[in-house]
Amino acid sequence: MNTNQRIITIGTICLIVGIISLLLQIGNIISLWISHSIQTREKNHPEVCNQSVITYENNTWVNQTYVNISNANIVAGQGVTSIILAGNSPLCPISGWAIYSKDNSIRIGSKGDIFVMREPFISCSHLECRTFFLTQGALLNDKHSNGTVKDRSPYRTLMSCPIGEAPSPYNSRFESVAWSASACHDGMGWLTIGISGPDNGAVAVLKYNGIITDTIKSWRNKILRTQESECVCINGSCFTIMTDGPSNGQASYKIFKMEKGRIIKSIELDAPNYHYEECSCYPDTGKVVCVCRDNWHASNRPWVSFDQNLNYQIGYICSGVFGDNPRSNDGKGNCGPVLSNGANGVKGFSFRYGNGVWIGRTKSISSRSGFEMIWDPNGWTETDSSFSMKQDIIASTDWSGYSGSFVQHPELTGMDCIRPCFWVELIRGQPKESTIWTSGSSISFCGVNSGTANWSWPDGADLPFTIDK
């Protein structure tokens, strides 16, 4: 074979090998395309599984969570039945108070991402209890915590988290922009009330299930403010009290009735020489009872009770066991304001039982420190200072602060009565301690008709923090 023949032979072999390789590549592409088409058709026609479809009526929501596990769509259905919280039951008979929650937020905040906050309160639906609180738009041990002793700023927001958990950006839910607030559940949805804006023109924004439903404009242009604790819902209607006017003189007080977040009725109290601020309200046998703060001139606490048509009665707790702070030493009470050492005050609460009353108060008569519960069997109507029981909550050497009431409805507890509960704010930082910030943690207790403990459950944080040094 000569040279030209060898060249032609080699070229022919290379051409044949190239053609075979090209055909193999084309076949590989066709195979991949067919395989992809088969997979696509399988995804577009998933295997049908046996599913039960349950239809709920009467204002019921069904929450469905889709969880992707190994490319399999699994539907986890959770039915949540809504009801109307009746609020028609009486308060449960109790003999003392059992510790219910403690969030330790200041202790945890020395190292964790915890909100700077104050004015915490608790409210329960028929399914859960949540802690609500007013943040300062800052975290503990961070530079933005500086100057958070200020009550009203555009950075304050109402948020909530599960009860007993330290409030952080990771477990908290935004509710409203607010420096004064209230919230409650009617069995069908959460109502939140958040007040924000300038002192001479603040506005309360009402939300129902997170949607704005109504607003209330300041009517006296002197720091519109509300409860800093839960509102009250009875038979689908919810009730709150707001104050507008001086903190050290006669102001204006209004009761609002709301349904699904919309105001349907309001009245202004005819209450000369009374001062109502930061009311702690609860339902009792279809009516609302509120025990409030007199920041003007009383050592004892004013109250207002009203029915669902807003027919109301007013008074002061008569007992000589005084509940405000600062206050006079216990002595002769009055069913009107006890004027001795009555200027200024602190948010607080009491529970009425017929002629008797459970009074929650600081142990100190001059500073927000210590806390105790006192049972005065005739203190709602009589003026003596005798009482039959005292339960220690916070030692007099530890800081306390605001306190307020909340309840657990029979729809939550399964009991045939409304369980009374209360929370105590444990304020730390400015103005009493050497920090750049002011914040608080909280504890809560619920009434029981069984054994309880006398002890102290303080905040317990070791101050100052790194940011303060």
From Swiss-Prot:
Its EC number is 3.2.1.18. InterPro entries: Glyco_hydro_34 (IPR001860), Sialidase_Influenza_A/B (IPR033654), Sialidase_sf (IPR036278). The active site is at D151 (proton donor/acceptor), Y402 (nucleophile). Substrate binds at R118, R152, E277, E278, R293, R368. Glycans are attached at N50, N58, N63, N68, N146, N235, N454. Residues 91-469 are annotated as: Head of neuraminidase. It is found in: Virion membrane; Host apical cell membrane. Residues 11-33 are annotated as: Involved in apical transport and lipid raft association. The keyword Transmembrane helix applies. It is an enzyme of class 3 (hydrolase). Residues 28-469 are virion surface. GO terms for molecular function: exo-alpha-sialidase activity; metal ion binding. Residues 1-6 are intravirion. Belongs to the glycosyl hydrolase 34 family. Catalyzes the removal of terminal sialic acid residues from viral and cellular glycoconjugates. Cleaves off the terminal sialic acids on the glycosylated HA during virus budding to facilitate virus release. Additionally helps virus spread through the circulation by further removing sialic acids from the cell surface. These cleavages prevent self-aggregation and ensure the efficient spread of the progeny virus from cell to cell. Otherwise, infection would be limited to one round of replication. Intact N-terminus is essential for virion morphogenesis. Possesses two apical sorting signals, one in the ectodomain, which is likely to be a glycan, and the other in the transmembrane domain. The transmembrane domain also plays a role in lipid raft association. HAMAP family: INFV_NRAM (MF_04071). This is Neuraminidase. It comes from Influenza A virus (strain A/Swine/Wisconsin/1/1967 H1N1).
